[in-house]
Amino acid sequence: MPFTKNQIITLEIEALSNDGNGVAHKDGQAVFVPLTAPGDVAEVRIVKPMKTYAFGRVEKLLTAGPGRVRQDCPVAGPCGGCGLRHISYEAECAAKTQFVRDAFARLGKLDVPVPDVLGAPDTDRYRNKVQLPVGTDENGHIVTGFFAGRSHRIVACTDCKLQPAWMNELAARTCALLEENGITAYNEETHTGRVRHLYMRQGWHSGQRLLCFVVNGNGLPNEAEICATLQKEFALTTILVNRNSERTNVILGRRTRTVLGPGVIEDTLAGVPLRMGVHEFYQVNTPAAEVLYAKAREYAGLKPDDFLLDLYCGMGTIGLSMLADCKRLVGVEVVPQAVEGAKETAARLGLDADRADFRCQDAGAAAAQLAAEGARPDVIIVDPPRKGCDEATLTAIAEMAPRTVVMVSCNAATAARDAKWLTEHGYKAVEVQPVDLFPRTKHVECVVKLTRG
């Protein structure tokens, strides 16, 4: 019999689901409860009953599970960004390992080794990029923060534990300067107000800092003075203004101009020199990304005469980080700015197109074209978005028949699905390594090694 809304029941949390919610069972139904830990015993209010399962929230914690720790962020619950801050990092790593194992066993139906997750070098202050929505609080003051789950209500946050302290301090100072200059925050309901988002990025190894104002309009009143003040106080390498006057939840508009500095920052990732503005995709946790890239390189097992194909290559960092191991690299990416960045990096490294060729194409279309041309890469790396690879891409990969396919994924479910498809078309799943790029959140990456035959 289904539960009823507002019904109070006592539950013991058994495990965490792959979205970070605690899972318990009662009367044959699963109940999902946010911000709980395995072993917790709690009085739970049913907030959303369904036919065969329900969602609840803790009314009273009766007994804490062994992995529960003191919550050290006052807005972690409503903010929704740090869904796992209430459990120890050891417990978090165990849960993330299980997320990936469950995906490949249950969804992929694959009997493949999944070692324990490779934990992140740092669990706090690790983000090299943040995009903060700008709004007003109940007193009319300008604030930044994060959207509450499943809403566009801003939860004000002055000290996000995941981003460097200077980003929090810069956000607070910017809000004060906006108020002092009579500049308003954007209101998406009325499509009025000026500043929509603050975008900040840091070169992790270089220390260079970028700030971009995303504005509804052409710029800011007193823009030069505000930017000069912030550049001086926070040692900013560059400041930009991005114009977004559309009624949209897409953060960045199409037009960006530089106010101060070079318009980009420089950094290195796995030894590859990079230049980044605001449009380029870049892993937000540099040290952990280097752990992931090292595992991908190990799985690739490249040889000196090999041809490496890097699909969904972004700025080319994975492929370029492996180029010393092989003879030729072709990278494919659909975002023009990323492809230009990859080409620029290759040129800075003294590589011509015969050695490192980057193409602006859809991954599936490019893979199909290469297969039709008779291309036979020895190793293919794919790093698709959360939706995974489409069947056209997988079909072309199977047709090109590389000896090794390395999949990098931010979604274990779609990675398991795609790996299963490849195992049905001539490949064997050798190993799946979870890697934690996003400590204190529900997200986990994985690297999959598949070999021909």
Which sequence ranges carry the predicted segments?
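Short, acidic/hydrophobic/Gly-rich beta-strand patch recurrent on exposed beta strands
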Residues: 22-27, 145-148, 212-214, 342
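Extended interfacial segments that mediate partner engagement and assembly in macromolecular machines
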Residues: 59-71, 77-185, 205, 220
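Short beta-strand micro-motifs enriched in acidic
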Residues: 36, 45-49, 133-137, 201-205, ...
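Short, solvent-exposed loop/turn elements at beta->coil junctions and helix N-caps
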Residues: 116-123, 188-189, 196-197, 201, ...
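Short, conserved phosphate/pyrophosphate- and ester-handling motifs at nucleotide-, phospho-/glycolipid
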Residues: 39, 163, 285
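Terminal RNA-binding accessory module
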Residues: 1-71, 75, 358, 365
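Carbohydrate-binding surface patches
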Residues: 199-203, 208-219
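Rossmann-like S-adenosyl-L-methionine
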Residues: 2-7, 18, 218-233, 237-453
